[in-house]
From Swiss-Prot:
Protein purpose: Catalyzes the attachment of isoleucine to tRNA(Ile). As IleRS can inadvertently accommodate and process structurally similar amino acids such as valine, to avoid such errors it has two additional distinct tRNA(Ile)-dependent editing activities. One activity is designated as 'pretransfer' editing and involves the hydrolysis of activated Val-AMP. The other activity is designated 'posttransfer' editing and involves deacylation of mischarged Val-tRNA(Ile).
Catalytic activity field: tRNA(Ile) + L-isoleucine + ATP = L-isoleucyl-tRNA(Ile) + AMP + diphosphate
This protein's name: Isoleucine--tRNA ligase
Record EC number: 6.1.1.5
Keyword hit for Aminoacyl-tRNA synthetase: yes
Motif range ('HIGH' region): 58-68
Signal peptide range: none
Cofactor(s) essential for the protein: Zn(2+)
Molecular function via GO: aminoacyl-tRNA deacylase activity; ATP binding; isoleucine-tRNA ligase activity; tRNA binding; zinc ion binding
CDD domains: Anticodon_Ia_Ile_BEm, IleRS_core
Amino acid sequence: MSDYKSTLNLPETEFPMRGNLANREPAMLERWNKDKLYQQIRDSRIGRKPFILHDGPPYANGSIHIGHSVNKILKDIIIKSKTLAGFDAPYVPGWDCHGLPIELKVEQKVGKPGQKISAAEFREECRKYAAAQVDGQREDFIRLGVLGDWHKPYLTMDFATEANIVRSLAKVISNGHLQKGVKPVHWCTDCGSALAEAEVEYEDKTSPAIDVGFNVVDKPALLAKFGVAQYNHDIAMVIWTTTPWTLPANRALAIAADLEYVLVSFTKEDVTRAIVVADVLHEDCVKRFGAESFEVLGRIKGSELELTRFAHPFLDFDVPVILGDHVTTDAGTGVVHTAPGHGQDDFVVGQKYGLEVANPVGDNGVYKADTPFFAGQHVFKANDNVVALLKEKGALLNHVAYRHSYPHCWRHKTPIIFRATPQWFISMDNQGLRSTALSEIQNTQWIPDWGQSRIETMVANRPDWCISRQRTWGVPITLFVNKENEELHPNSVSLMERVANRIEQHGIQAWWDLDAAELLGDEAEQYRKVTDTLDVWYDSGSTFETVVAARPEFQGHGVDLYLEGSDQHRGWFMSSLMLSTAMHAKAPYKQVLTHGFTVDGKGRKMSKSIGNVIAPQEVTNKLGADILRLWVAATDYSGEMSVSDEILNRAADSYRRIRNTGRFLLANLNGFEPEADMVAVADMVALDRWMVRRAAKVQSEIIAAYEQYNFHLVTHKLMQFCSVELGSFYLDIIKDRQYTAKRESHARRSCQSALFHIAEAMVRWIAPVLSFTADEIWQLLPGKREAYVFTQEWYEGLESITLESDLADSHWELLLSVRNEVNKELEQARRDKVLGGSLEATVTLYADTELAAKVAVLGDELRFVLLTSDAKVLPIDAAPESAVATELAGLKVLVAKTEAAKCERCWHHREDVGSVEAHPSLCGRCVTNIEGEGEARAFA
């Protein structure tokens, strides 16, 4: 055999079988950086149609987690696939840099501002801390193979961005959307600040649930309403609440106008009294209150009780009955304790009735000094004391511990309160912001489509947006208000532009350093500077304006796509929609795509306490970024995304199949020069032309899947193509021709030309997902080419040509089915020790007339398709009993061991081995391939 080895075309490549990604990828990243790859991509797309994916900024605090990785990889896949589609698709990553979490970290290091350190120094420390966090996260994102403008990202703390945030607020003001008011807002007593909707998490909490009686002031008038002539016992309207601490702020009792209310007399332990509650709940109520007997004395509509007055249970005033749409009969009594300073619904209904917005609670959650009974007590600790006082006053009808979902601070994980404070709001309804936003939601494509109804519900029900915070590290609300009437300076918009110019030069500290007289002159004495800062959701929500509209690479195009986790419907998607609608009366995006959260293999949330956290840094260090990228792409992101070591190892197995396919392609293109050796698709062997045609079809399906953001479909199509059509059919069949045909022969060059086209196409298919591997393959492909696959477009060399003489695609698919059935019998013969390998076999196909004609058309080349040394086709009627019926209708198969001699060069067993005296160990075909013109192939 050694004499003939040099006559074979053995595969050879520098592309290693093992990826060794964890070690090889960092060196590739260094080359990408040194070659300024991102800039090369930008230069290659000058003048092309833009596609703008705007990066939602992660918070500049802590290491990136697996959810961050999913998000950035999905964005990178889209950017790279859009670039391949010919778009100019810049990617500018960003970071959210202001806000409380950074303040808390800096406080741990240097103390609170105004104590050991000045506010100005504190802000500078916050800036340094955020910058260091950005640096750490940036390195981790780059390690994932994400290409972008990493050297010039956007930061919400960039001076220019801070200035643009101020300018954007000026637009909101000039369009009439800003208002000041005392309203109840989510308030964290640990933060000492208002919270945005998106900063509130709901957790279970046990609270005291109490039923409290408010005694009627004018008993005869109430009895008359119910048509009762006389009643000699106390009468109370009863509320049910889980926040006893809010009772000092009670200013009304709310009921539903259309509900029936009853006057019920009941006796408990020889004490008789009457209560007013909703009719549908009265039996539950008297049972809950331990009644031994009860009687309904009268029944009227809620609307008839409006403005009836009842005495506060422990404060020296009485409160009215008011009508509210928010009153339900899901639980309680059908009467709602109303404290306008401690609840959104209470506030809204209170405004209609001109109720006082009482707020007896300070920033720290402690009752103010002038609060009767509870001054100096923290509200949550005061709950028990409120209950005790109610009991003492005879107003407590029931008291139980109640487990329920309650809002908590996202940062401190502690319960929060609703608290009325003077704040700045973007009004949802004053200038029609809500209706415009709802209309714009309809003009946006939501992926998955359930995102639309989700955000519609949120917008329809959301309160005014409280955009002010009482913090140190944030973009200031750069307003001057009149000291006497709290009205904005009439020139606020132009003054804000002057302040923005200063911030652009010196950062937000310029506002705190500013003496009002520098801008207001003699008017300075009449105005005070606002010291509040903006909600950080305003910072990130305005980036369509402060970043996209401001940076030249976006060409003023506007944003095509926002892509974030499903929690951002109430976060970034919402704040961006509100601000874009407030500024421009249109949505900031054309498409919004959401992905699910990452969970472990059992569907559980990632948790350090459970020990199921998968850190992306560990994955890249162990398996490589391409494995992580393949897992992301192969997972349906529309739901929860399961990840575990086992799942990642499965992704690594899939990766090996793709890598092995790439290696086969490269190894068999050894010595192929496209310019000199290419066979036109029309001139190829039929099987090769069919394979190019199949690749063209797969490419169109893969491109369509990329366009629809169906990346799991991309990986499925890719794996199917590599494993089935290439791996177990085409590549198996062509090995013989590739290795044994004459090196320069048409038969071999045809096959190599097909492999070249497939490799050129496939390297592009995988580039958005397996970026490192695609680059590795690209560097080793033959022919002249640009430095990187990432500057290319989808391959156009896959000509879908069908000649008259060609077998139809369905014909090849039938042959593939026949081969699968033959393989089953060959495998059985191997298990039965009849054969060693398939080339020891001779196969007879007993087929019905139609099938026989389709199989026999290949003639002697049928054996190459079946990977046997001989293959015959006979009528099915001639099949002996030993022939095996297959799952393919009209086909029986008989496998036997050939008695022909084995050719030492091609390993086929042929009758003509030794027929040429000079080559006694070779078959006639191999002699032709060594000394003659080389064999000709028509089909395979």
